[in-house]
UniProtKB/Swiss-Prot annotation:
This is Protein-L-isoaspartate O-methyltransferase 1. The lineage of its organism: Bacteria, Pseudomonadati, Pseudomonadota, Gammaproteobacteria, Chromatiales. Catalyzes the methyl esterification of L-isoaspartyl residues in peptides and proteins that result from spontaneous decomposition of normal L-aspartyl and L-asparaginyl residues. It plays a role in the repair and/or degradation of damaged proteins. InterPro entries: PCMT (IPR000682), SAM-dependent_MTases_sf (IPR029063). GO terms for cellular component: cytoplasm. It comes from the Bacteria. It catalyses: [protein]-L-isoaspartate + S-adenosyl-L-methionine = [protein]-L-isoaspartate alpha-methyl ester + S-adenosyl-L-homocysteine. The gene is pcm1. It comes from Nitrosococcus oceani (strain ATCC 19707 / BCRC 17464 / JCM 30415 / NCIMB 11848 / C-107). GO terms for molecular function: protein-L-isoaspartate (D-aspartate) O-methyltransferase activity.
Length: 213
C-alpha cells in the first residue's frame, strides 16, 4: 500500500471515529478529511498524525486532539455563517487551516514567532490564501479587523478576557476553554446579544494555558 492510500485510509478511520464520538456537521467532517494533519506535525510524529490524540509541536505547545478541533469548530459554526473569524493561538496552524476551509477570512494571532513562521509556511504549501496572521499577545486579539462573527481560542485563560469579548460581533460566538492551567478546564460558548453575553459550558477539556506578555 502506498503512502498516499495509507494516509487516505487513516483519515477515513479518523472521520469515522469523530462521527462515532458525536461530530455530525458534514462540512466540518469534510474539511477535516481533506486537511493533511501530517503536514502540521514533526516528521518524526507523522505516523501518528491521524490518531485522535494531541501531539507535541515544541515550545511546550501541542496540536490539539482532532475531536477537540472538530468539537470547537462545530460549536463555532452552529452560530451561523462566518465571514470573519479570529483565532487566538495559531500553534501548528492545523486548527487555522480547518477554519479557513469554512470561513471567509481567518485572522490568527500567535505569540511564539517560530511556531507562526512554520504555520505560515504550511499555509503557503497548501495554497491557503484566506488566512491573515501576526505575532502578538493573543490576549489582545486583533481589534483592527473586528468585530468577528466567530472567535476561537486555542489556549486556556483563567477567565474570559474582556478584550476578546469586545471584539465579538452582536450575534457572534466565541468558543474558549476557561480555567486554571493545572488539571482540566471548561470549554465554553459565549454568544453576544444586543446588550449582554450568554454563556454555556460544553464539556471538560485540557488545554495549555493562554499566556500574556
Amino acid at each position: 500500500m502506498g503512502m498516499t492510500s495509507r494516509r487516505a485510509r487513516e483519515r477515513e478511520r479518523l472521520i469515522q471515529r469523530l462521527h462515532e464520538e458525536g461530530i455530525r456537521d458534514p462540512a466540518v467532517l469534510k474539511v477535516i478529511q481533506e486537511t493533511p494533519r501530517h503536514i502540521f506535525v514533526d516528521e518524526a510524529l507523522s505516523s501518528r498524525a491521524y490518531e485522535d490524540t494531541a501531539l507535541p509541536i515544541g515550545f511546550r505547545q501541542t496540536i490539539s486532539q482532532p475531536y477537540i478541533v472538530a468539537r470547537m469548530t462545530e460549536a463555532l459554526l452552529a452560530g451561523g455563517s462566518l465571514q470573519k473569524v479570529l483565532e487566538v493561538g495559531t500553534g501548528s496552524g492545523y486548527q487555522t487551516a480547518i477554519l479557513a476551509g469554512l470561513a471567509g477570512l481567518v485572522y490568527t494571532v500567535e505569540r511564539i514567532k517560530p511556531l507562526l513562521t512554520q504555520a505560515q509556511a504550511r499555509f503557503k504549501h497548501l495554497g491557503i490564501s484566506n488566512i491573515r496572521a501576526k505575532c502578538a499577545d493573543g490576549l489582545w486579539g486583533w481589534p483592527a479587523y473586528g468585530p468577528y462573527q466567530g472567535i476561537l481560542v486555542a489556549a486556556a485563560p483563567r477567565e474570559i478576557p474582556q478584550t476578546l469579548l469586545k471584539q465579538l460581533a452582536v450575534g457572534g460566538r466565541m468558543v474558549i476553554p476557561v480555567g486554571a492551567s493545572s488539571g482540566t478546564q471548561s470549554l465554553m460558548i459565549v454568544t453576544r446579544t444586543a446588550d449582554d453575553f450568554e454563556m454555556k459550558t460544553l464539556e471538560r477539556v485540557s488545554f495549555v494555558p493562554l499566556v500574556g506578555e
